[in-house]
Every structure is written in C-alpha cells, then in structure tokens.
C-alpha cells in the first residue's frame, strides 16, 4: 500500500505532497501553488481526485491524483456561496458538501466523472457552520452550527438536495460550540469535538427508543488547564480503538481509548505537539498520526503505539505558511 499525505498552507497558498513510507518517514513529492488561500481538503471516494476549498474567491478546486506518486494536476473548479471552512463528499462520489463558518451555510455541489459541475443546494441560517458529515449509510448529513450549539440533521436526496429531518437538530450544552465530527466504524456512534469548551460528545445514532442521544461528554483538557479553550479537530483510527482531538491554545493532542462497542471514551494521555494545531489526520493503516502547526509552519509525524494508542514522535517537517489541513490517501 502506497500512502500520500497532503498539507494545505493558506498563508503561502500551497499544497505540499508527501510520500509516507512504512517507517513513518515523509518524502516531499511536490509543492503545488494554489490560486487562492487553500484550506479544507478531501480525497474523493475513488481516490482519483483531491477537492480543496479556496478563498477569497470562494471556489472548490479539483486536482487529479497521479496513481504512481500522488502528485496533483489541476482539473476543474466550481464557485461556492461562501468562504469554505470544511469540505467532504458523499460515499459514492456524487456530491461535495462545503460548510461555511462566515456565511453560515452548507452547500451541495454535484460531481460528474469526479469533477465539480454545478451548485445543487444551499441551506442558510447555520450560524458558525463548521463541518458537514455524511453518515456511513450515506443518508444523513450532520452539520454542526457552532454558534448555535446545535447539530442540524438533513436527509440527502437522490438529486443532492438537503431535507430537514424530524427532529431537525440535536443540541449540545450551552457554550460548547460543536465543530468537527467522526463516526465509529460500527456505524452506531458519532463523536463531536466542541471548540469553545474543549470537550468531546459521544452520540448514539439510534438508542433503544430509535432516537439520537448524547451518551457521554468528556473534558479533553488536563485538570490543571486554566487558559482559553480552543479545540479544533478530531479523528478516529480505522479499527475504532483510538480517538484523538486537538486544542490550539494548549498545543496538545488528547488521546482517548474507545470501548469495544464505541459508546465510552476514556482519556489515556496528552501529547504536546506543534504550535496551534489546527488540523491533523491518521493514515489508512492506523499506525501514524500527522499534525499541522498553524503557528510553527511544520507538520509532525507520530507513531500510534501500544494498547493505549499513545503517540511517539517520528519526525517533523517544514511546510508552507500557516498549515491548517492534513489528508491522507492510500492506493
């Protein structure tokens, strides 16, 4: 299995393309100059394209991924209705979802042969919209509205329109600020990192009464932390055993173990990392974690070790200015 790591640096308008080997070493393959401040990125389900959101001219760009080394070639672009904060796709590669924090909306762009071709739908009124997350069954889009302490729930129609479900939302505690999400591989639970109080919520997608329920909320900060809380990103290993979340003020990654059924998180430790970690990701083998320091202008590679999933640094690498996003592609 070959793996490629992509890092987005908006201040220098660059994407760095890295080859990741089995020992956790990165080798630079390419530096792409992007026509705009590149921020969120996602790889298409068929692993042939990288979709990126740029500003100040709000667009989604599609890059073809070379099958031999992961290098990028520009392929197409499509306009967006707001500054892109988060980008994702449905599992069949038919639609791109973009959440916009500043515009307070989520948009759906149709893909044709892997390329963005037209805007299909826009839902407004999502104050502080910070991500769009499709459920494993490809039916429901979870959209956190950070400033409203709610996660809105939409059914994805066959033609790409978003239809509010009943109930249309679930709510966090006041002042939590739901931000990014991941789903457990067993499809029974979702985990949401809350930016403003640096906590993680565990959501059961269907409890015994057929309802969505928050079954656990866990503080992700050390007991003696007293500064401003500013959580950012969250990811889970492919086997569902370990979950990680980062805080930018403390410049740390919190390590969680996940119970076998996915319902309970336990804090296992805290890993100091690059300054102001805005984004990170986990490789497809579940062996390595790559974190980006927005203020250090470096990325760090960690090996995920032992039954607790603690992190051991393998190396750090200079990237562009203000790196914010990391994605990994395996082929």
Swiss-Prot record:
An example molecular function term from Gene Ontology annotations: 6-phosphogluconolactonase activity
Family matches, as Pfam families: Lactonase (PF10282)
Record field: catalytic activity: 6-phospho-D-glucono-1,5-lactone + H2O = 6-phospho-D-gluconate + H(+)
Segments crossing the lipid bilayer: none
Pathway: Carbohydrate degradation; pentose phosphate pathway; D-ribulose 5-phosphate from D-glucose 6-phosphate (oxidative stage): step 2/3
Entry-linked InterPro entries: 6-phosphogluconolactonase_YbhE (IPR022528), Cycloisomerase_2 (IPR050282), Lactonase_7-beta_prop (IPR019405), N2O_reductase_N (IPR011045), WD40/YVTN_repeat-like_dom_sf (IPR015943)
Top-level taxonomic group: Bacteria
EC number: 3.1.1.31
Keywords: Carbohydrate metabolism, Glucose metabolism, Hydrolase
Annotated SUPFAM superfamilies: Nitrous oxide reductase, N-terminal domain
Entry GO CC: cytosol
GO biological process: glucose metabolic process; pentose-phosphate shunt, oxidative branch
Family: Belongs to the cycloisomerase 2 family.
Role summary: Catalyzes the hydrolysis of 6-phosphogluconolactone to 6-phosphogluconate.
Name of the protein in question: 6-phosphogluconolactonase
Organism expressing this protein natively: Salmonella heidelberg (strain SL476)
Name of the gene encoding the protein in the UniProt record: pgl
């Amino acid at each position: 299995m070959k793996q490629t790591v992509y890092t987005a640096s908006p201040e220098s308008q660059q994407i760095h393309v890295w080859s990741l080997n089995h020992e956790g070493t990165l080798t630079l393959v390419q530096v792409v100059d992007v026509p705009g401040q590149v921020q969120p990125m996602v790889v298409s389900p068929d692993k042939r394209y990288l979709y990126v959101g740029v500003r100040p001219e709000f667009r989604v760009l599609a890059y073809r991924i070379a099958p031999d080394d992961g290098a990028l070639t520009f392929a197409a672009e499509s306009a967006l209705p707001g500054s892109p904060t988060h980008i994702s796709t449905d599992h069949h590669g038919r639609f791109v979802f973009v959440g916009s924090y500043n515009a307070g909306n989520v948009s759906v762009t149709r893909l044709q042969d892997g390329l963005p071709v037209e805007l299909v739908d826009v839902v407004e009124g999502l104050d502080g919209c910070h991500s769009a997350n499709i459920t494993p069954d490809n039916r429901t889009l979870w959209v956190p509205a950070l400033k409203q302490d709610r996660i809105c729930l939409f059914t994805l129609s066959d033609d790409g329109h978003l239809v509010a479900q009943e109930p249309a939302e679930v709510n966090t505690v006041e002042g939590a600020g739901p931000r990014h999400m991941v789903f457990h591989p067993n499809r029974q639970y979702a985990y949401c990192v809350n930016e403003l109080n640096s906590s993680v919520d565990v959501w059961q997608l269907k409890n015994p009464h057929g309802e969505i329920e928050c079954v656990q909320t866990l503080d992700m900060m050390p007991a003696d932390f007293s500064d401003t809380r500013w959580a950012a990103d969250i990811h889970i290993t492919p086997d569902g055993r370990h979950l990680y979340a980062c805080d930018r003020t403390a410049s740390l990654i919190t390590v969680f173990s996940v119970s076998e059924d996915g319902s309970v998180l336990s804090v296992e430790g805290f890993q100091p990392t690059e300054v102001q970690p805005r984004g990170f990701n986990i490789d497809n083998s579940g062996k390595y974690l790559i974190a980006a320091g927005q203020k250090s202008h470096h990325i760090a590679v960690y090996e995920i070790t032992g039954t607790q999933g603690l992190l051991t640094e393998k190396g750090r690498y200079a990237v562009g200015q203000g790196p914010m996003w990391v994605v990994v592609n395996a082929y």
